[in-house]
Amino acid sequence: MAREFKRSDRVAQEIQKEIAVILQREVKDPRIGMVTVSDVEVSSDLAYAKVFVTFLFDNDESAIDAGMKGLEKASPYIRSLLGKAMRLRIVPEIRFIYDRSLIEGMRMSNLVSNVIREDNARHIDDDVSEEK
């Protein structure tokens, strides 16, 4: 019987948990602030990890840039702590990527809500004009 998940998927899940804890407890850079690890993708050889993050202050581009620079600067330290927390032969090289999917999802949701609202308003206007 085939395995349900690849090893890289299981390692990615564990890395996501560990990095979230490390960012919350160990990294003291004020540029980073409130950060959420939304996803982790690990290469098949487990040598590289893309860590997708979002920030609490998503609407401020300069704060996002500063936060990303802080994460890049802290990346070697985070990698060393990750190596201590996990038992891996090779600790992946970490690359932080800002995750815009949440913002895009909210934007799409707002667009759909606006279209529905306009459509309902049009139907109400049509009903009122038919009654006259």
Swiss-Prot record:
Disulfide bonds: none annotated. Keywords: Cytoplasm, Ribosome biogenesis. One of its GO terms (biological process) is maturation of SSU-rRNA. Pfam families: RBFA. PROSITE patterns: RBFA (PS01319). It is found in: Cytoplasm. GO terms for molecular function: ribosomal small subunit binding. Belongs to the RbfA family. PANTHER family: RIBOSOME-BINDING FACTOR A, CHLOROPLASTIC-RELATED. One of several proteins that assist in the late maturation steps of the functional core of the 30S ribosomal subunit. Associates with free 30S ribosomal subunits (but not with 30S subunits that are part of 70S ribosomes or polysomes). Required for efficient processing of 16S rRNA. May interact with the 5'-terminal helix region of 16S rRNA. This is Ribosome-binding factor A.
